[in-house]
Amino acid sequence: MKTLILLSALVLLAFQVQADPIQNTDEETKTEEQPGEDDQAVSVSFGDPEGSSLQEESLRDLVCYCRTRGCKRREHMNGTCRKGHLMYTLCCR
């Protein structure tokens, strides 16, 4: 059940990222790595604000990052992120 919820949330996150309009500005068309680009945090939460069985400790504390060079220790790859035309690795812990 937890795995199904986690996978559903990640699929919804992927659809949301793809639904954002692509804006080609001068900053986004540069291919060199910008400082801080390696640690772009994405917070994922589950359930309603009043609390439910979906808001267990393990699910509420899920933190994901869009990384350029792969996942760090204690993180696992959960897919890809896209910002403009650049693709990143989605790493969660």
Swiss-Prot record:
GO CC term, one of those recorded: extracellular space
Pfam families from the UniProt entry: Defensin_1, Defensin_propep
Cell location: Secreted
Disulfide bond annotation, renumbered to this chain: 64-92, 66-81, 71-91
Predominant cellular place of this UniProt entry's protein: secreted
Organs and tissues of expression: Paneth cells of the small bowel.
Entries under InterPro entries matching the protein: Alpha-defensin (IPR016327), Alpha-defensin_C (IPR006081), Alpha-defensin_N (IPR002366), Beta/alpha-defensin_C (IPR006080)
Stored PANTHER family: ALPHA-DEFENSIN 1 (PTHR11876), ALPHA-DEFENSIN 1-RELATED (PTHR11876:SF2)
Keyword Disulfide bond part of the UniProt annotation: yes
Role this protein plays: Probably contributes to the antimicrobial barrier function of the small bowel mucosa.
Propeptide cleavage-removed residue intervals: 20-58
UniProt-annotated stretches for the region Disordered: 22-56
SUPFAM superfamilies assigned: Defensin-like
Protein name: Alpha-defensin 7
One GO process term, biological-process aspect: defense response to bacterium
Record keywords, A-Z: Antibiotic, Antimicrobial, Defensin, Disulfide bond, Secreted, Signal
Signal sequence segment: 1-19
Protein biosynthesis as UniProt keyword: no
Family under the similarity heading: Belongs to the alpha-defensin family.
